[in-house]
Amino acid sequence: DEFKVKVIPDNAAKILALRNGEIDAILGSSRLSAEGYTEISQDAAFGHAMDDSTNQTRYLGMNLNKAPFNDPLVREAISYAVNQQELETSVFDGLETAAETLFTNEKPNCGVEVKTYPTDMEKAKQLMKEAGYEDTNDDGILEKDGTSLAIHFNYSQSLASVDNAVLSIAASLKELGFDVTIDAVDMNTWYGALMAGEYDLTF
């Protein structure tokens, strides 16, 4: 017996290949978008299974060695600004739930009480003001010491559903007053930048 692995980067193309009989299975939740999984799971022609137990948590990575993320007030503001409920329902189609800790409380020794950050844009804006950022020219972008709050937000485009998640997060940051440039790169480029510390914000 043998099996062949076929790499199909595009999410829609994967589903089409499955429907056309070109492939027999799609393996891994990171390789299929939430809407793609929902589409397949609702089709009686296909079987599907999802493991309820996972050690994986998606998180927003900030480079603490660079401004503005070296300021805890800015980091707290971002925590209030990002709409986790929208990510849970609209981006991940209810298949993933918002996490308050790195590991789910269902895991051994992980049921800890932590401070939570419900979505509160007004609170986020107040924290940015406390950190010294203001929109002095009414262009929607915050400034501090004459410098606009511009950041690069990079991510690996090889993982399903991440595109929409990044767009949702970027929209929240723009509402907060960030000038966000999104950089979608391949996995190797993303990982190399991460290890070298050559990033502002990553997902």
PLM regions: where:
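Extracellular/periplasmic solute-recognition and catalytic clefts
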Residues: 4-66, 89, 201
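Append "and occasionally in soluble cytosolic enzymes with long acidic Gly/Pro-rich linkers
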Residues: 49, 70-171
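Short, hydrophobic alpha-helical packing/hinge segments within bilobed ligand-binding/sensory domains
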Residues: 14-15, 23, 36, 74-75, ...
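Short loop/turn segments at beta->alpha junctions
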Residues: 9-10, 32, 83, 120, ...
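Short, well-ordered beta-strand elements
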Residues: 2-6, 25, 148-158, 180-183, ...
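Sec/Tat-exported extracytoplasmic proteins
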Residues: 22, 27-30, 41-44, 64-66, ...
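Periplasmic binding protein-like
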Residues: 18, 174-203
